[in-house]
Amino acid sequence: MIFSTLEHILTHISFSIVSIVITIHLITFLVDEIVKLYDSSEKGIIVTFFCITGLLVTRWISSGHFPLSDLYESLIFLSWSFSLIHIIPYFKNNVLILSKITGPSAIFTQGFATSGILTEIHQSGILVPALQSEWLIMHVSMMILGYAALLCGSLLSVALLVITFRKNRKLFYKSNGFVNESFLLGENVLENTSFSAKNYYRSQLIQQLDYWSYRVISLGFTFLTIGILSGAVWANEAWGSYWNWDPKETWAFITWIVFAIYLHTRTNINLRGANSAIIATIGFLIIWICYFGVNLLGIGLHSYGSFTSTFN
């Protein structure tokens, strides 16, 4: 009872803090001068990280097993992963771009986890025999950390595509005469003062998005690879085969292939930027199919802890 109450308190405290942090981010996005307010939001994410950590530890102690046995626990761990990805660059380089992605991602996942949809599995149950293995921590934690990093990196690529598309659309309007000559003449005058600085800022932003997208996706790909390999070893111990082409395994392999292609395109300078970002955007959709969409089916060797099983 005590652990359940503590878990309930930590869940709502962390969710409330993340909600406040998102609001602060929106305010600082509109008013750049409020530096102290932004610093408060960063401290809020750190507090959220420790609250979610306390929540996971509490659930671990109360259940007797690592809290990664169902969809609710994996969503909480995913939210924890987003917070972890947020605070590490903050302490090292104070990366502002990444925080715009990790904050909303954390509140989205934790908000869904604490919603009424998953109420029936909020209480920890007995671990099913298939999950009673020392590989649980290694395999599932690496997979969730991989998903979190890949999602963040993919969202950075989506932002890169949006900015690039807006820039190209403006150039398209100019080249096809959709803007009248007098307007272009006035614009050319302004280019001597503000256009160069604006384009420099946009170019720097695109480069940063591309750089951090690559860095975060590389990290996520490493986690995903470790997760798949450890899962194969676990599968051999549990089911007698390293690979069974289960729906979850198949989509995890597809996810790995997509991001392997992304990393391969990065070796070609001409394919960096928007071209590789398109592949990462496709990967973003594939991750959600692998992580959440397959659970909707409720079939296969990974059907335990699925979304549909919560209502059976």
Swiss-Prot record:
Q: Give an example GO molecular function.
A: heme binding
Record has Lipid metabolism as a keyword: no
Q: How does it sit in the membrane?
A: Multi-pass membrane protein
Q: Where in the cell is it found?
A: Plastid, Chloroplast thylakoid membrane
Q: Name one GO biological process term.
A: cytochrome complex assembly
A single GO cellular-component term on record: plasma membrane
Q: Which UniProt keywords apply?
A: Chloroplast, Cytochrome c-type biogenesis, Membrane, Plastid, Thylakoid, Transmembrane, Transmembrane helix
List the InterPro entries: Cyt_c_assembly (IPR002541), Cyt_c_biogenesis_CcsA (IPR017562), Cyt_c_biogenesis_CcsA/CcmC (IPR045062)
Task: Give the principal location in a single coarse category.
Answer: plastid
Q: Which residues cross the membrane?
A: 9-29, 44-64, 71-91, 111-131, 143-163, 216-236, 251-271, 277-297
Q: Does the keyword Heme apply?
A: no
Give the superkingdom in one word: Eukaryota
NCBIfam families with a match to the protein in the record: cytochr_II_ccsB (TIGR03144)
Q: What does this protein do?
A: Required during biogenesis of c-type cytochromes (cytochrome c6 and cytochrome f) at the step of heme attachment.
Family the entry assigns = Belongs to the CcmF/CycK/Ccl1/NrfE/CcsA family.
Tell me, how does this one assemble?
A: May interact with Ccs1.
Name of protein: Cytochrome c biogenesis protein CcsA
Look up and give the organism this protein is from: Atropa belladonna (Belladonna)
- The gene that this protein is the product of is ccsA
